[in-house]
Amino acid sequence: RGLGDVYKRQTKTIFLDHLSILISGLDGDERKMIDTTMTKLRSLVERTGIKLFLVSHLRRTQTDKNHEEGARVTLGQLRGSAAISQLADEVWGLERNQQTEAVDQTILRVLKNRYSGEVGVACQLKYNKDTCKYDETTEPIFNPSTDF
């Protein structure tokens, strides 16, 4: 669908899952294609005022601990291009250790916040199999005065 549909339908929010699929099948350098796509998406957000949530996969870690084992997510691990983090207003990382009994728990980490600059662990989420939703856990896992 084109930009006209965004205006016609008065779209307020778009979820794009995921960036790699958007550019797959195109010929050329992946990094340059991501740069171009991110610039166009940023322009779309500026022109229309929509909220755009974009999913980006991660590069493998350079440490002994990988993401499947709960490794901390960083901006530099976004796969493809630095334009992903440079053009975003906010970047969030989801961290989950699949090798533990608490496999249903996920940490939401703010990696970039253009407006306030506050980054760090935002909350811990727990997957509810009955509702198929994530709920924020009631037990705090961070100290707001030191983790932001």
Over which residues does each language-model region extend?
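C-terminal regions of RecA-like/P-loop NTPase motor modules
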Residues: 1, 5-15, 28, 39-48, ...
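Walker B catalytic acidic pair
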Residues: 18
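Short glycine-rich anion-binding loops that position phosphate/pyrophosphate groups of nucleotides
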Residues: 21, 58
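Conserved ATPase-coupling elements of RecA-like P-loop NTPase cores
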Residues: 23-30
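…and closely analogous acidic/polar surface helices at protein-protein or active-site interfaces
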Residues: 34-37
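Structural recognition of the conserved hydrophobic beta-strand(s) that form the central parallel beta-sheet
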Residues: 51-57
